[in-house]
Swiss-Prot record:
The keyword Cytoplasm does not apply. Keywords: Ribonucleoprotein, Ribosomal protein, RNA-binding, rRNA-binding. This is Large ribosomal subunit protein bL31. Coiled coil: none annotated. GO terms for molecular function: rRNA binding; structural constituent of ribosome. Gene3D superfamilies: Ribosomal protein L31. It comes from the Bacteria. Part of the 50S ribosomal subunit. The keyword Ribonucleoprotein applies.
Length: 94
């Protein structure tokens, strides 16, 4: 005999919510589904191009790959530490 009550609750009219608006209904195991992008505002379907900066991902990319404004500052610091190491090292004198 199969076990009873092992399946999650099914909501045939689950609401899909984007930016506070109900954009569609579907069947799901959750009563509400919150999304950032759906076909009504996705750049591919609307023909527009925009950057979706969710949680600062663009800024993180810029920092990670050295495209931020502080790139020159960090390279200057590296140069000064390397110069210091060279000047502090003992010289070989015979």
């Amino acid at each position: 005999m199969p076990k009873e009550d092992i399946h999650p609750t099914w909501y045939p009219d689950a609401k899909v919510i984007c930016n506070g608006e109900v954009v569609m209904t579907t069947g799901s195991t959750q009563p509400e589904i919150h999304v950032d992008v759906w076909s009504g505002n996705h750049p591919f379907f609307t023909g527009t191009q925009k950057i979706l900066d969710t949680e600062g991902r663009v800024d993180r990319f810029m920092r990670k790959y050295g495209m931020a404004d502080s790139e020159n500052d960090s390279t200057d610091k590296k140069k000064t530490t390397n110069e210091k190491k060279v000047s502090d090292s003992p010289s070989k004198e015979s």
